[in-house]
Amino acid sequence: MGCAPSIHVSQSGVIYCRDSDESSSPRQTTSVSQGPAAPLPGLFVQTDAADAIPPSRASGPPSVARVRRARTELGSGSSAGSAAPAATTSRGRRRHCCSSAEAETQTCYTSVKQVSSAEVRIGPMRLTQDPIQVLLIFAKEDSQSDGFWWACDRAGYRCNIARTPESALECFLDKHHEIIVIDHRQTQNFDAEAVCRSIRATNPSEHTVILAVVSRVSDDHEEASVLPLLHAGFNRRFMENSSIIACYNELIQIEHGEVRSQFKLRACNSVFTALDHCHEAIEITSDDHVIQYVNPAFERMMGYHKGELLGKELADLPKSDKNRADLLDTINTCIKKGKEWQGVYYARRKSGDSIQQHVKITPVIGQGGKIRHFVSLKKLCCTTDNNKQIHKIHRDSGDNSQTEPHSFRYKNRRKESIDVKSISSRGSDAPSLQNRRYPSMARIHSMTIEAPITKVINIINAAQENSPVTVAEALDRVLEILRTTELYSPQLGTKDEDPHTSDLVGGLMTDGLRRLSGNEYVFTKNVHQSHSHLAMPITINDVPPCISQLLDNEESWDFNIFELEAITHKRPLVYLGLKVFSRFGVCEFLNCSETTLRAWFQVIEANYHSSNAYHNSTHAADVLHATAFFLGKERVKGSLDQLDEVAALIAATVHDVDHPGRTNSFLCNAGSELAVLYNDTAVLESHHTALAFQLTVKDTKCNIFKNIDRNHYRTLRQAIIDMVLATEMTKHFEHVNKFVNSINKPMAAEIEGSDCECNPAGKNFPENQILIKRMMIKCADVANPCRPLDLCIEWAGRISEEYFAQTDEEKRQGLPVVMPVFDRNTCSIPKSQISFIDYFITDMFDAWDAFAHLPALMQHLADNYKHWKTLDDLKCKSLRLPSDS
């Protein structure tokens, strides 16, 4: 049983007849308005969209009498009769159960009705459009008004009918219709163009589409121009046609055309509101640099009113003379290619003062896939020179601290960093995010000296503010990664399917992977080997002819270091070192005599342990040979100066001096004196460099540094230390990744003539020279897999034997076995070599080859890998097939 609709009378005489919210009876929502010169019964009828199309045109739109009857019937609680078919729809029911009503509606028009509430996109914005409202302004009911009324019903639009200009304007101001249809066929009742102008004079009409219904023109008359209608404020003209489908098609076209476009334009108001309240100065120009928009922050920053800027070309504005002469050309070249430009730019304010800005210019692609606009974001650099200008901007604009950007508020406490504003709330955890970040952000802002990583974090935090939630969360994860100490090192996981790789990682890349609680075991081997009696230094003429003849080939990569080891009775370092150092003019650079250099080599070689299977002076000579070979490559030679070359040769010579034949993990687990001394961090590498300098400077007879000035010595010493420490395997991936990102990629971009705005390779920059030297000695240190096959096999046997001996001692002393696969009874040497090459060698030498061009080495690497792979496929665990032994 239905409930009577409630009736409200406005002061202007408008009577609204609304459904009772508690009613569930099916009935039509109607409202009746009284115009100033009309009787009370009604001058316009509103109907919400029906769920079904009336069965016939004959039933027509409800007349005044029908509305009265519908109101009476609804008031008595009965359903509307057939005299008013629109009143018999399920609209009342839909107010209470929309989903069920839609499911029950099975007409061919249902999908059409849903269009009006479909999602609309404008750029990244998602909008939901409310059902379309249509206002029909017809002085009297006729077939044309009926046609539009039923077309609205079919399309699912809400419709109002007004009979007078006054009631039409009142209704429009109340409901803000998207479409207005005005009867322009007759002039005796009202002036259609005057009605249109009166509506256009109101603010809500800015995005309304107004349609003029004009009389059909006979064939013998010329059609009138549409310009007077457009000048009056109409958007479209509709030639009289009372067909419902013709009216329906017209309305649907308007909805998907002008109404949808106007809806998007109306949504742009929110974007402009955001721009107006943005702290960054924003400037939008056309493709030919005519200023189209500036926000209030831009006006405050530059001292201009927007009226002074809009429509002007950027070239007409005063320029600062503090910029580079070619800066504007550089910027234009970049943005004309459709690429973003970012950098520091000096701008001139209206007052004539120059201010330094962080500027980001983004091209915007428009019609035809061409650049149509440029958007510039500008922020003041908070430098000392800008402080006065910032104060002046504040004073002129009258901004208080509540509206100032952070870059202004922290102007006296920060230098040269991107502003970080308060982190906007995101999702349900926003309060916790904000509370968690604020103290740290405040501390970052208060820094007077900022590290590069701090600036990076500032930029990311600033980017989070205007990012979608998913992007902000991803940037949170980025920040967590950046706050770790191992930025370039991969996360090392255990490879169950490859125990060799797992053990190599554990044994070479960790210090004391499995520690004992109290260092119960002490490494007792004397790693500070006492000096053996040294023979008198030899002269160049004392070198035996057989050694001299062998050294004639030392510049070749295929030089056989083991032949030199045998012929020199395991003292190859002195002989090879003298030859290599002479070739690179080391004595001349250090201003030392050859006698001093020979004495130094003898002292260093004496402190290598000949009892070690691998880490002995032959390995040092091999690394020195590889380093010298790399220094002879054209690109390496062009990247380093002589001091770098001398430092590299010395570092290669001493890089493993006094090596005990055990890994860092072993020393840490054993609680050795060296591990305690160096806090379990880079134990051996720190010891090698420290001992090398101790041995060098304690005796003037072998002090090769005694004749260079203090500054040169400090620079040389730092370079040597840095290179030796780079051989520590825990930093392996960090060094390789830095080299690839800082050297290889920029160099590749240069070679390929890329248009990207990246910095040049800058190989001669000090920071890049450091990366090159680190990479060079790392490759020289583990170049065995890139040697000719016979040499590669010999080195593989030696390193395996040293690891076997360590495993034996770990078991004997009850220490953790850090590399269990290196058990001499079960180990597969081919598998261990394959794992070492796959995990450590291939990527590093690919990167080094891309820089230094080493095709012969890469071929050896491929051949050797094939050798080990063949042995492994045959289940052979030794260095060679039994038939080859």
Curated annotation (Swiss-Prot):
Pathway: Purine metabolism; 3',5'-cyclic AMP degradation; AMP from 3',5'-cyclic AMP: step 1/1. Abundantly expressed in the thyroid. Also very weakly expressed in brain, spinal cord and placenta. In the thyroid isoform 1 predominates, and isoforms 2 and 6 are also highly expressed. In the placenta isoforms 1 and 2 are expressed equally. In the brain isoform 2 predominates. It catalyses: 3',5'-cyclic AMP + H2O = AMP + H(+). A divalent metal cation 2 binds at D656. Its cofactor is a divalent metal cation. Residues 18-41, 72-95, 393-436 are annotated as: Disordered. It comes from the Eukaryota. A divalent metal cation 1 binds at H619, H655, D656, D781. Gene3D superfamilies: 3'5'-cyclic nucleotide phosphodiesterase, catalytic domain (1.10.1300.10), PAS domain (3.30.450.20). GO terms for biological process: behavioral fear response; cAMP catabolic process; cAMP-mediated signaling; negative regulation of insulin secretion involved in cellular response to glucose stimulus; negative regulation of steroid hormone biosynthetic process; neuromuscular process controlling balance; operant conditioning; positive regulation of ERK1 and ERK2 cascade. The keyword Phosphoprotein applies. Pfam families: PAS_9 (PF13426), PDE8 (PF08629), PDE8A_N (PF23198), PDEase_I (PF00233). Residues 23-34, 422-436 have a biased composition (Polar residues). Residues 75-90 have a biased composition (Low complexity). Residues 539-875 form the PDEase domain. Residues 267-338 form the PAS domain. InterPro entries: HD/PDEase_dom, PAS, PAS-like_dom_sf, PDEase, PDEase_catalytic_dom, PDEase_catalytic_dom_sf, PDEase_CS, PDEase_PDE8. The active site is at H615 (proton donor). The keyword Ligase does not apply. The modification Phosphoserine is found at S517, S754. It is an enzyme of class 3 (hydrolase). Belongs to the cyclic nucleotide phosphodiesterase family. PDE8 subfamily. Hydrolyzes the second messenger cAMP, which is a key regulator of many important physiological processes. May be involved in specific signaling in the thyroid gland. Composed of a C-terminal catalytic domain containing two putative divalent metal sites and an N-terminal regulatory domain. This is High affinity cAMP-specific and IBMX-insensitive 3',5'-cyclic phosphodiesterase 8B. It comes from Homo sapiens (Human). The gene is PDE8B.
